[in-house]
């Protein structure tokens, strides 16, 4: 992904050499005058972007050149010298410190009450008087926004949606025909941090939540935005009450998720998957198309297409 300028802005004219000093890099290798103009995940690296990597097996897959890579000594020999490498003990912590310096929220008036005059709202949309609609929000035709809803700056809601009472949406793109249940929170930062001797280092989340057309989200659900990429919910997904979808998750189209399910970070769920109540899925797991996870299943490894887990 690239930095979304509706939500974020990146510091200008920061070179690799500048950043090495900021994050306390022990060594720097390669072209140190590269000016950083974007943030990317490692697998989407492009020239002049900042990325990080701590796994030597993945480090050797880097394609391209002129990126700035926060990494460690183990990965260094595997990265093309046309990139600039900043060496730190913990690349993930170094990356967190780098983002804290480079990326800031785009300026917006968060003191808005009622409907901001800078919001774009279709004439046929219905907005409850107690709802808060911040600047740069877009609401499509026929959409209903109920009492107590808060739509933070930059949120986009398609046509014929229901955003039900007291839900809070930020860093979200919602397609047409969506139904967001009462009290749900979409687009908050995910549960990403590193524990150090000096305390907790929180990892910035600069991604979004992207929800396709005709998705139903139950009451009291939480869907966290992505850390670098997006959290993505496919079309026609049905999600029951009290579910948690963590950062960077992808849920395939037409999947059904019963109440109290928890999906950990960076999980990929295929199309047409069925999850019974209280299913828990561990991070980075892949669930194949059409798989069935029966109630209270704990999934810690990949599941093939069409398999059933009890």
Task: Give the location of each predicted region.
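Glycine-rich hexapeptide-repeat left-handed beta-helix
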Residues: 165-310
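Generic structural signal for beta-strand residues in well-ordered domains
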Residues: 43-45, 62, 78, 118, ...
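Right-handed parallel beta-helix
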Residues: 110-171, 175
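Terminal amphipathic alpha-helical/low-complexity segments used for targeting or macromolecular assembly
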Residues: 1-118, 177, 183-184, 189-202, ...
């Amino acid at each position: 992904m690239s930095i979304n300028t509706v939500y974020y802005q990146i510091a200008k004219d920061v070179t690799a050499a500048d950043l090495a000093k900021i994050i306390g890099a022990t060594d720097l290798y390669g072209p140190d005058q590269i000016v950083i103009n974007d943030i990317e995940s490692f697998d989407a690296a492009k020239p002049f972007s900042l990325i990080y990597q701590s796994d030597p097996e993945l480090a050797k897959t880097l394609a391209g050149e002129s990126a700035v890579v926060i990494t460690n000594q183990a990965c260094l020999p595997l990265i093309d010298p046309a990139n600039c490498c900043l060496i730190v003990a913990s690349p993930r912590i170094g990356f967190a410190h780098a983002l804290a310096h480079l990326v800031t929220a785009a300026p917006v008036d968060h003191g808005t009450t009622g409907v901001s005059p800078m919001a774009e709202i279709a004439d046929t949309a219905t907005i409850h008087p107690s709802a808060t609609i911040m600047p740069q929000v877009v609401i499509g035709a026929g959409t209903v926004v109920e009492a107590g809803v808060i739509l933070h700056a930059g949120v986009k809601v398609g046509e014929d949606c229901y955003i039900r009472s007291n839900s809070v949406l930020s860093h979200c793109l919602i397609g047409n025909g969506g139904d967001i249940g009462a009290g749900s929170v979409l687009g908050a930062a995910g549960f990403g941090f590193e524990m150090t001797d000096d305390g907790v280092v929180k990892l910035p989340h600069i991604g979004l939540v992207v929800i396709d057309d005709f998705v139903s989200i139950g009451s009291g659900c939480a869907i966290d935005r992505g850390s670098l990429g997006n959290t993505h919910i496919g079309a026609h997904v049905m999600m029951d009450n009290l579910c948690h979808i963590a950062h960077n998750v992808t849920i395939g189209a037409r999947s059904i998720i019963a109440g109290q399910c928890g999906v950990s970070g960076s999980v990929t769920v295929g199309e047409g998957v069925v999850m019974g109540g209280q299913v828990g899925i561990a991070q980075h797991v892949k669930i194949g198309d059409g798989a069935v996870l029966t109630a209270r299943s704990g999934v810690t490894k990949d599941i093939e297409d069409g398999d059933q887990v009890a």
